[in-house]
Regions:
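A detector of single, family-specific signature residues
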Residues: 1-239
Length: 239
C-alpha cells in the first residue's frame, strides 16, 4: 500500500478493498496511472466487467481514467515501482491460493472427525476446527462452566465480590484462540440463531451494551458446545 500511495495516492478512493479481486486484476495488468491511461476505455471496461462479474463497467473505467489523469504521484523510478506492485499482487494471490488449499484440507480433516460442532449456528468448518483444536478431548471438562472458564469467557468479579450495571467484563484467562473463535461464532448467532438472537435482544432491551450481550451469548454458546460434544448430538435451537 505504501508503494501504491507513492505512485497513485488517489487509488484508495477507487476501490473499497485495494486488494479485492477486481483491484488486484487491474493492478496486475496496469500498476501505474500512466498504464491505466494508455489502455483503451473499451479494454479497461472489459477487464473490470470480467473481474467483477458484471459489477463494474464503463462508468468505473472512466472514473479510473479520470483519477489517473489528475494523479499527483511521484514520476521517477516508474519501472521499479511497477515491478514492485506486480510482485506484491502476485505474492498476495499466491498466499490466498495457499489459504484456500489449507481451508480445503481443514474441511476434509473435520469430516473424518464426524463432529456435530458445525451444526451450531455461526460455526463453520474453519471455526469448528479451531474450537476443536483448542478444546482437545471434551472429557477433560466435567461441566460446561469449566469450558467457559477455559475460554476466558467467565465474568470477572470486582473486589467487592459483585458485578453490577450494564457492562460486565470477562476474565480473558485460558485460550485466547478458543475465546476468539467462540466470540466470532457468538456474534453471528446473535443475529442468525433462532434462540440466541432472542436472548441477545432481551439483553439489549434491558439496557446491556452490545459487547456485554455478545459476551453473554458466547457463554451460552460454550454451554451448547459442551453439550453437543459430550452427547455427540447435533444442535437444535431451544426456542
Amino acid at each position: 500500500i505504501t508503494i501504491l500511495d507513492q505512485v497513485f495516492p488517489e487509488y484508495s478512493d477507487l476501490f473499497s478493498d485495494t486488494f479485492g479481486v477486481t483491484s488486484k486484476e487491474l493492478l496486475s495488468k496496469y500498476p501505474l496511472p500512466e498504464n491505466m491511461l494508455e489502455v483503451s476505455t473499451k479494454e479497461l471496461t472489459s477487464l473490470l466487467n470480467k473481474a467483477s462479474k458484471g459489477r463494474f463497467g464503463i462508468g468505473k473505467a472512466q472514473e479510473i481514467k479520470e483519477y489517473a489523469t489528475k494523479s499527483f504521484g511521484i514520476s521517477f523510478a516508474k519501472e521499479t515501482f511497477s515491478f514492485q506492485i506486480k510482485q506484491i499482487i502476485n505474492q498476495i494471490s499466491f498466499i490466498e491460493s495457499q489459504l484456500k488449499e489449507l481451508e480445503k484440507e481443514i474441511t476434509n480433516i473435520l469430516k473424518t472427525l464426524n463432529s456435530e460442532i458445525t451444526t451450531i449456528t455461526g460455526i463453520g468448518d474453519i471455526l469448528g476446527a479451531s474450537i476443536l483444536g483448542e478444546i482437545g478431548d471434551i472429557s477433560r471438562f466435567e461441566k460446561a462452566s469449566q469450558l467457559v472458564a477455559f475460554a476466558g469467557l467467565d465474568v470477572a468479579i470486582n473486589q467487592s465480590g459483585e458485578f453490577t450495571g450494564t457492562e460486565m467484563k470477562i476474565t480473558k484467562r485460558g485460550s485466547p484462540y478458543l475465546r476468539r473463535s467462540i466470540w466470532i461464532a457468538a456474534t453471528i448467532a446473535c443475529f442468525k440463531d433462532p434462540a440466541l438472537s432472542v436472548y441477545y435482544k432481551k439483553l439489549i432491551d434491558r439496557g446491556k451494551k452490545h459487547l456485554t450481550a455478545v459476551g453473554a451469548v458466547a457463554r451460552k454458546m460454550c454451554n451448547i458446545i459442551f453439550s453437543v460434544l459430550k452427547n455427540k448430538k447435533p444442535y437444535t435451537p431451544n426456542i
